[in-house]
């Protein structure tokens, strides 16, 4: 029995439960942030506005600031945005880390940043004010003046090789143009942003619509999607532009300031913005921010803020960087834009766990550079809180996303024809009566999770997601086709699909009556997916609250699905990163017969239900709790964790008296400080390698 259900639980039990609930709150928020980062950086299709994402990110930062023990190396606050997501492009390692930027949203936050900077460099430092172009970050490498490679940011260390596509851009020269003043360097890594001019974006979308293809939601998505085409010929047909805004690794080029570096880039034939201004002091910085806030639509491309950088490179080096962003630069982001439109209707959508979500269906309106007609309303309570009626003129806010936010109604424009939204009492897909999952929940759900068509579609689609089995070819259209044809009854049937099954679906059948190439690829990918690790199986089961982080923790702790099923709720909750809420959801899920039937179907089809340990790797860290903080040159975040786990250790996210070692890389942060305070041994990367190989008796670096 948990402390919560014991009336006379002591302070220690209550404190333990409070800590677990706090960690669950952090984990849920971190998982939500990573989910939106995936949609933004990999799928080029965000589902919330930049402003809403910024709020989520700030909530996570605030929670970690209040409880530093929660701040793990794999927290989104410690990583560059695209970290940890696999793609179809060849990995390309940056010569020097390609960091992101910290954001500020008002003058007070800008002042706080400038105060920290001035404390180090004084009041009269020179700054560069650059327009923050809303596009896709790109790094170009020139060797002896010739373009060698182009790569996206990725996780800051490794991006995607898009060299062939980048070569099609008019703004990317194949060769640098040397001069007596600026001979080209032996090696030059230059950073920039790929974007569409507004007029070019509108023309592109018009062409797509004329061809019967879906248009892009906004210029940023179109730039990312166009540069990341598998066929460079498609990229070549789209008028992408680029502007350079920084340098990385160099040989034979040592500028003393960014201003000087930009002059050299321009001389070599690289595109540099004409709108960048060098100013003295923060008063001048604030003036430039105010100016561009009023003139943001006077230029040919969209901007969402101004980037402020220290100009002197020596001062930049003095300030250094965190694991994700330089301390010498910051992005001042303008408030998201607003518009008014007519709320034509409020409709509902049913998700894979049965959650019924209302959304606004509006007259299309141009805002922030794109046309918008839909917006989420979250739940019935939110609709009531905002006070919107069907037929209202509403204010919407958008910051370059696909689905904007409805702020509220313009009450003075009501004419009496408006009507109140009534949340349906029964599922619009299957007719089942709706109800909250538990008393007090704001969300209502369709309890017919087994056969509700909407939930089935979403679950089948979820099985193929990158965070689950990662099955290429099983998209939303395929999920619908398989279910409608009766080829599968639920996700349990996926791994027994045959060519004969696919011939029953028009989607996977050629005009000649054979299985299409896409169908054959789907079957092959389903076969490969059977060997995916246990944590992906757990995610694919659509257990409420179980995302990749909790799934990894459970798989690492128990090793097999059977062991997880047999574990008690207390044993599950004791796993770091799980907690009582997730533990209860896991136990509840496995009490449902048809849930277990899905597992047994997968098991019978050969899906891997246990992680095999490599017997050739010595268990040098058996029982040791090890925390890795900062950036390691030879290990990614996941590689360091896997190395610890494979040797019997526990890759912990926070430092305590039970921590055996803390491994500190570049910019280690508060975990390093806590280790020193607690007297926990701290290892550098060489010491970590020795520890992995030889165990605790290894010399400490």
From Swiss-Prot:
PANTHER family: CHROMOSOME TRANSMISSION FIDELITY FACTOR 18 (PTHR23389), DNA LIGASE (PTHR23389:SF9). NCBIfam families: dnlj, PRK07956.1. Its EC number is 6.5.1.2. The lineage of its organism: Bacteria, Bacillati, Actinomycetota, Actinomycetes, Mycobacteriales. The gene is ligA. NAD(+) binds at residues 50-54, 100-101, 130, 153, 193, 309, 333. This is DNA ligase. Disulfide bonds: none annotated. It catalyses: NAD(+) + (deoxyribonucleotide)n-3'-hydroxyl + 5'-phospho-(deoxyribonucleotide)m = (deoxyribonucleotide)n+m + AMP + beta-nicotinamide D-nucleotide. It holds the Pfam family BRCT.
């Amino acid at each position: 029995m948990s402390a919560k259900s014991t009336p006379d639980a002591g302070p220690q039990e209550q404190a333990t439960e409070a800590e677990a609930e706090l960690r669950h709150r952090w984990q849920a928020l971190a998982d939500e942030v990573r989910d939106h980062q995936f949609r933004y950086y990999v799928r080029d299709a965000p589902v919330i506005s930049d402003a809403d994402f910024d709020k989520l990110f700030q909530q996570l930062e605030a929670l970690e600031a209040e409880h530093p023990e929660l701040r793990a190396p794999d927290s989104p606050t410690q990583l560059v945005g695209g970290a940890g997501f696999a793609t179809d492009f060849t990995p390309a390692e940056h010569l020097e880390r390609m960091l992101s930027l910290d954001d500020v949203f008002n003058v007070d936050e800008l002042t706080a940043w400038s105060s920290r900077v001035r404390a180090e460099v004084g009041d009269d430092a020179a700054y560069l004010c650059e327009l923050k172009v809303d596009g896709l970050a790109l790094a170009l490498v020139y060797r002896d003046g010739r373009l060698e490679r182009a790569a996206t940011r990725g996780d800051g260390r490794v991006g995607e090789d898009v060299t062939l596509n980048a070569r099609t851009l008019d703004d990317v020269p194949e060769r640098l143009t040397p001069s007596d003043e600026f001979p080209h360097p032996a090696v030059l890594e230059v950073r920039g942003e790929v974007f569409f001019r507004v007029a070019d974006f509108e023309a592109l979308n018009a062409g797509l619509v004329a061809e019967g293809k879906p248009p892009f939601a906004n210029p940023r998505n179109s730039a990312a999607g166009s540069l990341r085409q598998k066929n460079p010929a498609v990229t070549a047909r789209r008028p992408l532009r680029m502007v350079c805004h920084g340098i990385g690794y160099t040989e034979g080029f040592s500028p003393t300031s960014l201003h000087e570096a930009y002059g050299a880039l321009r001389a070599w034939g690289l595109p540099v913005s004409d709108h960048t201004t060098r100013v003295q002091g923060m008063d001048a910085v604030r003036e430039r921010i105010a100016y561009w806030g009023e003139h943001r639509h006077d230029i040919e491309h969209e901007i969402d803020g101004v980037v402020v950088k220290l100009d002197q490179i020596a001062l930049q080096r003095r300030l250094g960087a965190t694991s994700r962003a330089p301390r010498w630069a910051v992005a001042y982001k303008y408030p998201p834009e607003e518009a008014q439109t007519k709320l034509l209707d409020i409709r509902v959508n049913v998700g894979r766990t049965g959650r019924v979500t209302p959304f606004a269906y509006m007259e299309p309106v141009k805002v922030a550079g794109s046309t918008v007609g839909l917006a989420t309303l979250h739940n019935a309570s939110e609709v009531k809180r905002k006070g919107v009626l069907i037929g209202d003129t509403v204010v919407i806010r958008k910051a370059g996303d696909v689905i904007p936010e409805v702020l509220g109604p313009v009450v003075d424009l009501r004419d009496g024809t408006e009507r109140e939204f009534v949340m349906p009492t029964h599922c619009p897909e299957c007719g089942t009566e709706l109800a909250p999952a538990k008393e007090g929940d704001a969300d209502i759900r369709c309890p017919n999770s087994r056969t509700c068509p909407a939930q089935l579609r979403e679950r089948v689609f979820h099985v193929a997601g990158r965070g689950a089995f990662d099955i290429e070819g099983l998209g939303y259209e395929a999920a619908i086709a398989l279910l409608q044809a009766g080829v599968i009854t639920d996700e349990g049937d996926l791994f027994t699909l045959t060519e004969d099954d696919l011939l029953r679906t028009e989607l996977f059948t050629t005009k000649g009556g054979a299985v299409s190439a896409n169908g054959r690829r789907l079957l092959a990918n389903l076969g490969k997916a059977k060997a995916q690790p246990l944590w992906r199986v757990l995610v694919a089961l659509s257990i409420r609250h179980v995302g990749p982080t909790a799934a990894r923790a459970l798989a690492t702790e128990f090793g097999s699905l059977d062991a997880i099923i047999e574990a008690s709720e207390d044993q599950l909750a004791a796993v770091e990163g799980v907690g009582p809420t997730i533990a209860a959801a896991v136990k509840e899920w496995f009490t449902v017969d048809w849930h277990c039937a899905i597992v047994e179907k997968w098991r019978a089809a050969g899906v891997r239900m246990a992680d095999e340990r490599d017997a050739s790797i010595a268990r040098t860290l058996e029982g040791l709790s090890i925390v890795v903080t900062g950036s390691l040159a030879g290990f990614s975040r996941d590689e360091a964790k896997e190395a610890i786990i494979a040797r019997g250790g526990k890759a912990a996210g926070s430092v305590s008296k039970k921590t055996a070692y803390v491994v500190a890389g570049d910019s280690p942060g508060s975990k390093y400080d806590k280790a020193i305070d607690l007297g926990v041994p701290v290892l550098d990367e060489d010491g970590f390698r020795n520890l992995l190989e030889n165990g605790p008796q290894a010399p400490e670096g």
